[in-house]
Curated annotation (Swiss-Prot):
Assembly information from the UniProt record: Forms a complex with cdc7.
Compartments reported by the entry: Nucleus
Pfam families: zf-DBF
Disulfide bonds: none
Post-translational modification: Phosphorylated. Stably phosphorylated throughout the cell cycle.
Record's function text: Regulatory subunit for cdc7 which activates its kinase activity thereby playing a central role in DNA replication and cell proliferation. Specifically required during the initiation of DNA replication in egg and during early embryonic development. The complex cdc7-dbf4b phosphorylates mcm2 and mcm4 subunits and is required for cdc45 loading.
Name this polypeptide is given: Protein DBF4 homolog B
Keyword NAD included in the entry's annotation: no
InterPro entries linked to this entry: Replication_Regulatory_Kinase, Znf_DBF, Znf_DBF_sf
Region (Disordered): 222-243, 299-332, 348-368, 495-529
SMART domains: ZnF_DBF
Gene that encodes the chain: dbf4b
Sequence ranges assigned to domain BRCT in this UniProt record: 27-117
PANTHER family named among the record's database cross-references: ACTIVATOR OF S-PHASE KINASE-RELATED (PTHR15375), PROTEIN DBF4 HOMOLOG B (PTHR15375:SF24)
Length: 784
């Protein structure tokens, strides 16, 4: 195209001093003036447009070819390509013809005649005459594009070329946009200063382990089959060329060279090296030193992003043993939920960061620093909430429990006997913050942790528990957390407590005297063996000197939840604790000592895998007391119930209703995970010392008077303490008026407690279950 432009107006383009715009206008005026054209193209629409354009630009169309024609326009591109050079002047015709001449080739006469005939047939007579006369031959497409370029209006993008002040018109270069087709590789510059590098492939390169003399990233080229004649010629040429030497590979594992990689990999020497586990010991040691932030998901955990975000707040939990019962002095109705958090990156928990006591951080009690590095610990976040009070939590603490998978795998999918020793929970003076001391039955002592409890009163502030004490004081009331075995049956069906055997723990759960103020005459706690499962026991009151207790656990069945395997089981169990308080508990009578009965219903979810044991137990506790003996001698040791009522620092939670031995009227059946009344079975009632005898049942007026004697001198009555004593009934049915039988007498004797009667009201009436309860609530809230 450039040659066409230079030929058509060569003398005009040589003037470089004129500006481009003026130069283009002048070219349009004198481009084809005085020029003659001969068109060697078929008659069509393009020929008509070309004839009109040449006429507008001042050119002349000749009808016959002659020596006076300046340009010959042809539609054959081969004829234009065969022309060696284009002459710009007629005086150079002889030089062009001399340049086209070739040296003669010696050939026979017959070949020369054949070439002449072929040449005459291929070449047109018009083009042959034009070449012989020195006329310029142009291709029709080049002429059309050139004319369109001349007739195009000037562009508006005129910019200054130089900074000296000379104006120059220029057009912006057009950007070439290409769309890459996969497979391709594109490398871009982040600063956008350099153009990107791209490379497209017909097929993406693949690793090749067959070729030994090439890179494994190079694709293997398939050999195309050729004709036999061509193969003979190539074989003759290959015989003359020296063959390239084949390169050999080197195996660093075997430290030897090989000719073919595929043959070496299946060889005996290399297979012996790979089969030896010590060959890669150095690599394993280096990999063991690296830290890995990834953690294995527990069995049955969700994999979706939404489920993972929701499961970050509640992970798989270690469980409390089925059946936890607490005394009335420390909030009998509580829902205990243990939430397990994850280990740190190294798989261990730091003693300094986990809030361990001072004697553990200072290096006491059986080398805890060494075990802290050896035993993997799991951070257990314990949140205990009141079942019926939703305004504030009762207990919030943090414990550390060992990973039971450190010693071995769990050999059974069912929860076996516990491996826990005694666990002591103590309240200090002036606060209700207990301290948890946990220990495994295999001799490993766990790390102590601080337990913080928020009192129920709004004015009181939570205080941290002091960890300086090592022995429990005998004067302060305390609770004992004992180990309890679990009876399991893989049967289905039934209700809570209807199936399963009963296991007595009167001898197996005796605590050590060095950790708890209990003078027990029975056998010491035996070391359990077998399963590595971990379970926490029920909470029962500490007995006085000479006291005894009977702890029975009933477990109905195991169930497999929907969408899970046999590794995830669901257990329902009920634990009943019967304790005799007082020094003469070995010969109990209804007139001598009070009787304490605690029931607990729990649902346990167990997840047994090859690496860890995790479960969650939701327990509901219920505690009741018989009336105290009015003829107790002054020299006798006060019982736990009397110490509890006399303690002014013990805060009690509000209750919606009390879970007595018989269900209250109008109570709807609920699941075992909620606050539900439990009825003792006949086999357990037969075991009571006072079974079959007439027992004097307390009434609320007597209980309030008896409770008020502790603070009669001060003129105040602890309403929260009185509300913790439940109402016992032997009748299976009662009316709503029976619940309010003793309310007037209570208000007459205690007029100062009118503003605090919410505890008594919520302990007697289920407010959310009847219209009668709502009306009673409105009446009792008015001031007298």
């Amino acid at each position: 195209m450039a040659s066409v432009i230079s030929v058509l107006h060569g003398q005009v383009m040589q003037q470089d001093d004129e500006p481009p715009l003026a130069k283009r206008r002048r070219c349009r005026e004198i481009t084809f003036a005085g020029k003659s054209f001969y068109l060697d193209v078929p008659a069509n629409r393009q020929t008509q447009l070309l004839t009109k354009a040449i006429g507008r630009l001042g050119g002349i169309i000749e009808s016959f070819l002659s020596r006076d024609v300046d340009y010959v326009v042809t539609g054959s591109k081969k004829a234009v390509a065969s022309v060696s050079s284009v002459a710009t002047r007629r005086g150079e015709k002889s030089q062009i013809q001399a340049a086209e001449r070739k040296e003669p080739i010696h050939c026979s006469r017959g070949k020369q005649l054949l070439k002449k005939v072929v040449h005459s047939q291929e070449c047109n007579s018009v083009l042959t005459n034009a070449r012989s006369w020195g006329v310029t031959v142009l291709y029709v497409e080049d002429v059309v594009s050139y004319i369109e370029r001349l007739e195009r209006p000037p562009s508006r993008g005129i910019q200054n070329k130089t900074a000296e002040g000379r104006a120059a018109d220029s057009t912006r270069p057009s950007l070439k946009i290409a769309r890459l087709r996969s497979p391709f590789i594109k490398i871009e510059d982040q600063s956008r200063k350099f153009r990107p590098l791209q490379c497209t492939f017909t097929s993406f390169p693949e690793l090749s382990f067959v070729c030994s003399d090439k890179s494994p990233f190079e694709t293997v080229q398939t050999v195309k089959k050729k004709d036999p004649g061509d193969q003979e010629e190539e074989e003759g040429q290959r015989s003359q060329k020296p063959q390239a030497r084949k390169r050999k590979g080197y195996c660093e594992c075997c430290e030897e060279t090989f000719d073919t990689l595929s043959e070496h990999l299946v060889g005996e020497h290399h297979f012996r090296f790979v089969s030896n586990p010590l060959s890669y010991k150095m690599i394993d040691d280096l990999a063991a030193q690296l830290t890995c932030d990834l953690m294995e998901l527990p069995f049955g955990s969700p994999t979706s992003p939404e489920a993972e975000r929701s499961s970050q707040n509640e992970d798989w939990d270690l469980d409390l043993a089925p059946g936890e019962a607490e005394p009335a002095g420390n909030e009998g109705h509580e829902l205990g939920i243990l939430k397990a958090t994850r280990l740190d990156k190294d798989g261990h928990a730091d003693c300094e960061d986990q809030g361990a006591p001072a004697y553990l951080r200072d290096g006491g009690a059986e080398e805890p620093d060494q075990r802290c590095g050896e035993i993997p610990l799991a951070n257990i976040e314990v949140d205990v909430y009141n079942v019926c009070s939703f305004d504030q939590p009762v207990v919030t603490c943090t414990m550390e429990l060992p990973d039971v998978s450190a010693e071995g795998k769990i050999h059974s999918n069912l929860l076996g006997s516990t491996v826990g020793d005694e666990r002591v929970l103590q309240r200090t003076n002036g606060t209700c913050e207990p301290h948890i001391d946990l220990a495994l039955g295999n001799g490993r002592e766990l790390k102590h942790a601080e337990l913080q409890k928020d009192p129920l009163t709004k004015d009181s502030q939570p205080e941290l528990l002091s960890t300086a004490h090592e022995q429990l004081p005998t004067s302060a009331p305390c609770m004992l957390l004992e180990g309890a075995s679990v009876v399991h049956f893989p049967s289905h069906g039934g209700t809570v407590g209807s199936q399963g055997d009963v296991t007595s723990h009167s001898a197996a759960n005796k605590p050590h005297t060095e950790n708890c103020p209990v003078d027990s005459t029975g056998d010491r706690h035996a070391q359990p063996a077998g399963s590595d499962a971990l379970a926490m026991s029920c909470v029962i009151p500490t007995l006085d000197n000479g006291g005894r207790h009977v702890d029975a656990t009933m477990q109905s069945h195991w169930e497999v939840p929907l969408g899970c395997t046999t590794d995830t089981l669901l257990s329902y169990s009920t634990t009943v604790t019967v304790g005799e308080l007082g020094p003469e508990a070995h010969n109990p009578t209804p007139e001598q000592q009070p009787l304490l009965i605690s029931t607990c219903s729990s649902i346990t979810t167990v997840c047994c895998t090859d690496t860890e044991f995790k479960s969650c137990t939701v327990s509901v506790h219920s505690t009741s007391h018989s009336p105290p003996n009015q003829n107790v001698k002054s020299n006798q040791t006060p019982s736990l119930l009397e110490m509890d009522l006399a303690n002014p620092n013990c805060h009690r939670a509000k209750r919606k209703h009390w879970d007595s031995l018989l269900s209250p009227p109008g109570k709807k059946p609920t699941s075992p995970s909620h606050c539900q009344s439990l009825t003792l079975p006949m086999w357990l009632l037969c075991q009571f010392p006072n079974y079959g005898q007439q027992v004097q049942l307390p009434v609320w007026a007597d209980l309030c008077k008896w409770d008020g004697t502790a603070a009669a001198e001060e003129g105040t009555v602890d309403c929260s303490s009185s509300s913790t004593l439940p109402k016992l009934h032997q009748d299976s049915f009662s009316s709503e008026s029976d619940w309010d039988a003793h309310l007037p007498s209570f208000f007459q004797n205690n007029p100062q407690q009118s503003l605090q009667c919410g505890d008594l009201r919520t302990a007697q009436v289920t407010l959310n279950e009847s219209w009668y309860g709502k009306q009673l609530c409105n009446i009792l809230t008015h001031d007298p």
